[in-house]
Amino acid sequence: KQRAIRANKSGADICIRLHADAASANVRGVSVLYPSQQNHYVAKLSKKSKKLSKNILDSYCKSTRFKKRGLSKRDDLTGTNWSKIPVALIEMGFMTNQNDDLKMADSSFQQTMAEGIANGVDAYFQ
């Protein structure tokens, strides 16, 4: 909740939440979460948040060549439920998958990850 409030007060046009996922060791890839229209607290942000999420997912997966797991609507995350600006939560890979984890820990690959996200943000604003 506090991060969403901070983002709201920052004057930013969007909020991107960076996460790494966990599951069984054979699960890998990237997903991006956004608020659904069914959530009355953020329904008005859903369409823009979905566009932002899709742009980030497509660009990030193109840059990193990580498996694209898709978009997910979520209504149970305080970081999105308190947002007043379009918001996307990117699960950048799986820490429990050796391949994803090793890449995410590599500093040069982190630059590739950042570029993928930045390109998605650029696409959103075009």
Regions found by a protein language model. Name each.
Residues 41, 54-55, 63, 123-126:
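Charged, low-complexity C-terminal accessory regions
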Residues 3-7, 56, 117, 121:
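Generic hydrophobic alpha-helical segments
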Residues 1-52, 111:
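Catalytic-core regions of hydrolytic enzymes
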